[in-house]
Amino acid sequence: MKIHLSTLDPAQLETDALIVLAIDGGDKDNNKPQLQAKSDAFAKAAADLIASKEITGKLLEIATLHKPEGVKAKRLIVVGVGKAKSFTSYELRKAAGAAVRALKKSVKSAAIVAPENWGGAADPSTTSTLMFERGGLPEAVKAIAEGAVVANPDYNYYHSDRKTYELDELTILVPANGHANDLEAAMKEGHVIGESQNFTRDLVNEPGNRMTPTILGQRAKKMAEEVGIQCDVYSTDFLHEKKMGAFWSVSQGSEEPPALIVMKYEPAGAPQSPVLGLVGKGITFDTGGISIKPADGMEKMKYDMAGGAAMIGAMRAIALLKPNVRVIGVVCAAENMPSGKAQKPGDVQIAMSGKSIEIINTDAEGRLVLADGLHYAKQLGATHLIDAATLTGACMVALGGINAGVFANDEDYFNRFAEALKKSGEKMWRLPIDDDYKELIKSPIADIKNTGGRYGGAITAAMFLKEFVGETPWIHLDIAGVAWQEEAVPFLAKGPSGIAVRSIIELVQSFG
């Protein structure tokens, strides 16, 4: 999708579709929805829809007016953004996405009026100037670009009769306020982030026979060449050389070799510290190994590499946005398969750190590859770590399909990430990693075991990872419940969500 900015009068713009936002006026009869754009032409064109309550301004409600009087656009699309007091870039991103998905089967280009203020009445609860997290109109433009780009694709690539419906071009209409450079930069940033999230989604969507560890490494290397960062991909011999026994143990049952993907973004002039280490679980297909999963739903285990894909997508955006901070990306890719060579429950593996691990359940494999990945990122110089993984079904049970789980061992680092979350619009919820939980992963025959029993599974998995980060500030994202969109929603297709890409980018930018 191409995105442009324009300062033309929206009512005078000739376009297939013009998108205007509406604020929810409330439930009382006299609280009419307010169109975002201050225009007599829009007000007149939408008067009948407002009178008939086809437009209320409720979040994601969409009404269409064909051949609107006084407006040169062929159709006027009014999208609700909810109440003014709760309207942030989170709602705006959704609204832009919903408009794109509603239009993309019928038009190839559209325009949207960026919110500046609601104007008019004195009541700040209904007509307040929009207070976005990073300051007004630029944040709005960025959110529109992100939401529109992410909403555009559908994931039916392997239909033999596939028809592609995508919006080719979007114009964001902004006032001529003398801040053109800021708005252009915000638009480009949103476009890069949205495209990088879609890059991640493309990786996650591929079936296991078309996304092996080797292929994932090839895709990462190709991306790195395109954006100008270093990427090295290592396999079995390197894992043995580095004594990555935990990582190797997961891959040993598969005919497909593992891939350790190492990406480096090192801008000239960046300080030697901090160095951010992004570590992702890249299990390209997870049968569970000898502790095999039920057949029902196993096809979805192609997305068990969503954490690794998120790190690859984030590194793409980082390279293009060029923050002044060093970043290392480490993705541990493998298949978890049963065979005569596969690891067994009761085996003891030695991690790169030297810790011994009793294998209780071979389906608790993600934490094994991350254990070596986190330790290796530290060896490469990372001063701050963040990992992402579709790690536990327990996190899905606890938080459902709405929030990812967040764990952190450092309050300052977590607070920085919490601010990044607000800016990204991604939904995550912090869970505890108290030392009391450590008892649950103790083993009588090894330093630790790879599962902690029935209860608190997401927490005990995080406690396991904590054993491999030491005192390094670290954040763990358990994205198991939110990496895959089970059903389409107005602003997002069914399929991979690309979760964690935006928040990780915001975190990195906060350092540089």
From Swiss-Prot:
Mn(2+) 2 binds at K281, D286, D304, E365. The keyword Glycosyltransferase does not apply. GO terms for biological process: proteolysis. Disulfide bonds: none annotated. This is Probable cytosol aminopeptidase. Its cofactor is Mn(2+). Belongs to the peptidase M17 family. NCBIfam families: PRK00913.1-2, PRK00913.1-4, PRK00913.3-5. The active site is at K293, R367. Binds 2 manganese ions per subunit. Its EC number is 3.4.11.1, 3.4.11.10. It is found in: Cytoplasm. It holds the Pfam family Peptidase_M17. CDD domains: Peptidase_M17. GO terms for cellular component: cytoplasm. It comes from Koribacter versatilis (strain Ellin345). Keywords: Aminopeptidase, Cytoplasm, Hydrolase, Manganese, Metal-binding, Protease. Presumably involved in the processing and regular turnover of intracellular proteins. Catalyzes the removal of unsubstituted N-terminal amino acids from various peptides. Its main location: cytoplasm. The keyword Nucleotide-binding does not apply. InterPro entries: Leucine_aapep/pepB, Macro_dom-like, Peptidase_M17_C, Peptidase_M17_leu_NH2_pept, Peptidase_M17_N.
